[in-house]
């Protein structure tokens, strides 16, 4: 199955000149979603993770069902102020300013093997921030995976962990 056939292309979203790759149509097709999760399992399982970390918010849609499929724990990497209780934070640079990601304290234990998941790899900034945050907590980030890679943005070259993607777009 060609997963690209199930990913809708939305021109001029979220702003003019941007071509948005929408996984909503992939999620809505049970056969395509099963194939997607099966392929994700094949690339993630060999990294022998103890836990999967999903990046807010569409990364949750990938990581949570995959964690269930693989019998692993699931951890949410969220934007600042979205998690209750004590958190560990990491601030990172954006093109114009900064942003912060956080994880609940104790959600990842020192030495645990973690794979980070998201729906899409663009520049790699958020993925690197999540990796640095989890590393700061003592986790061993052994890889990352996403459904879509925008290879023309060269995020793979900027990421600090091995990454797998199921489909790539060159423009």
From Swiss-Prot:
<comment type="subunit">
    <text>Homodimer.</text>
</comment>
<comment type="similarity">
    <text>Belongs to the purine/pyrimidine phosphoribosyltransferase family.</text>
</comment>
<dbReference type="GO" id="GO:0005737">
    <property type="term" value="C:cytoplasm"/>
</dbReference>
<keyword id="KW-0963">Cytoplasm</keyword>
<dbReference type="InterPro" id="IPR005764">
    <property type="entry name" value="Ade_phspho_trans"/>
</dbReference>
<comment type="function">
    <text>Catalyzes a salvage reaction resulting in the formation of AMP, that is energically less costly than de novo synthesis.</text>
</comment>
<dbReference type="GO" id="GO:0006168">
    <property type="term" value="P:adenine salvage"/>
</dbReference>
<keyword id="KW-0660">Purine salvage</keyword>
<keyword id="KW-0328">Glycosyltransferase</keyword>
<dbReference type="Pfam" id="PF00156">
    <property type="entry name" value="Pribosyltran"/>
</dbReference>
<dbReference type="GO" id="GO:0006166">
    <property type="term" value="P:purine ribonucleoside salvage"/>
</dbReference>
<dbReference type="GO" id="GO:0044209">
    <property type="term" value="P:AMP salvage"/>
</dbReference>
<dbReference type="GO" id="GO:0003999">
    <property type="term" value="F:adenine phosphoribosyltransferase activity"/>
</dbReference>
<dbReference type="GO" id="GO:0002055">
    <property type="term" value="F:adenine binding"/>
</dbReference>
<protein>
    <recommendedName>
        <fullName>Adenine phosphoribosyltransferase</fullName>
        <ecNumber>2.4.2.7</ecNumber>
    </recommendedName>
</protein>
<dbReference type="InterPro" id="IPR050054">
    <property type="entry name" value="UPRTase/APRTase"/>
</dbReference>
<dbReference type="InterPro" id="IPR000836">
    <property type="entry name" value="PRibTrfase_dom"/>
</dbReference>
<keyword id="KW-0808">Transferase</keyword>
<dbReference type="GO" id="GO:0016208">
    <property type="term" value="F:AMP binding"/>
</dbReference>
<comment type="pathway">
    <text>Purine metabolism; AMP biosynthesis via salvage pathway; AMP from adenine: step 1/1.</text>
</comment>
<dbReference type="InterPro" id="IPR029057">
    <property type="entry name" value="PRTase-like"/>
</dbReference>
């Amino acid at each position: 199955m060609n997963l690209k056939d199930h990913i809708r292309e939305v021109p001029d979203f979220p702003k003019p000149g941007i071509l948005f790759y929408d996984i909503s149509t992939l999620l809505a097709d049970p056969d395509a979603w099963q194939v997607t999760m099966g392929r994700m399992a094949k690339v993630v399982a060999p990294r022998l993770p103890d836990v999967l970390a999903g990046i807010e918010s569409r990364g949750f849609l990938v990581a949570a069902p995959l964690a269930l499929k693989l019998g692993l724990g699931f951890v949410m990497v969220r934007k600042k102020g979205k998690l209750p209780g004590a958190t560990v934070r990491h601030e990172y640079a954006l093109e114009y300013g900064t942003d912060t990601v956080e994880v609940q304290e104790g959600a990842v234990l020192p030495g645990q093997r973690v794979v980070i998941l998201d729906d899409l790899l663009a520049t790699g900034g958020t993925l690197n921030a999540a990796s640095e945050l989890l590393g700061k907590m003592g986790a061993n980030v052994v890889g990352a995976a996403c459904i879509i890679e925008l290879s023309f943005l060269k995020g793979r070259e900027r990421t600090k962990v091995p990454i797998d993607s199921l489909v790539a777009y060159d423009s």
